[in-house]
Amino acid sequence: MRHDLWAPVLLRAVVALVFAAVTVFWQQPSLTTGRWLMAFFLVGTGISAIFLQVRLNRREDVDLGASRSIPQSYGVLYVLGGALTAVVANSDWLLVLLCAVIMGLCGITELVLGMRFRREFPLGRDWSLCGVVTVFAAMGMVLVENLGTKAELGVAGGAAIVLGVSQLVAALSLRHDARAADGTGRGPERVA
C-alpha cells in the first residue's frame, strides 16, 4: 500500500486514548498500578513510533534526509524507558524521574523533528504538537510529584487526551488523503 502512514498514527492515538481513559476513571491507583500504566503508555507510544519508521522506510516518496531514522530512535527510547519504568520504579519520585526524563527527551526530539518538517511533510505539524505536549507533560509530572500517583497519572493522562485526539484526527486525515490519492475514496457512481 502506497499511502499507509495512517496506521501507526492511529495506533498511537488508540494507545494514548486507552491510557487516558484508564487514568481518568481509576480513582485511587497504587504505585504499582501507576508504574504499569506508565509503562504501557511509554511502550505503546514507542511501538507506534517504530511502526511509523517501518512504514516510512517503505515509502520512496518521503525524503526526511538525515532525519529519516529519528522516529525509530525515540521509539526505541520510549520502549526501553517503559520497560525500565515497569521494572525499576518502586517509588513515586523514581517513577516521575524515569517518565519525565524519557518523555522530555522524546518530546524534544519529536518537537525538533516536527519543526524541521512542518511545511514539507504532513506529519510535521503533528510531531510539533505531540512534542510540545509531551515536554509539558514531563514538566507537569515533576511539579506534582509530591501529590502522589493519582496526580502524576492525571498530568500524563491529560496530555494523553490531547495526544490521542490530535493523532486520531491526523490518522483519519491521512487515511482520507490516502484513499483520495489512490482513487478508492469514492463509492460507486450513481446513475440517474
Task: Label the model's feature ranges.
Residues 1-63, 146-149, 172-192:
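N-terminal topogenic module of multi-pass integral membrane proteins
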Residues 11-16, 38-51, 69-83, 101, ...:
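Core segments of alpha-helical transmembrane spans in multipass integral membrane proteins
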Residues 19-20, 80-90, 133-150:
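Hydrophobic alpha-helical transmembrane segments in multi-pass integral membrane proteins
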Residues 30-46, 90-105, 154-161:
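Structural signature of hydrophobic alpha-helical transmembrane segments
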Residues 62-77, 98, 122-130:
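Cytoplasmic-side transmembrane-helix entry/capping segments in multi-pass membrane proteins
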Residues 80-127:
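Membrane-proximal helix-loop-helix units in multi-pass membrane proteins
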Residues 98-108, 122-141, 155-165:
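Alpha-helical membrane segments in multi-pass integral membrane proteins
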Residues 110-119, 141-145, 163-178:
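Membrane-water interface at the C-terminal end of transmembrane alpha helices
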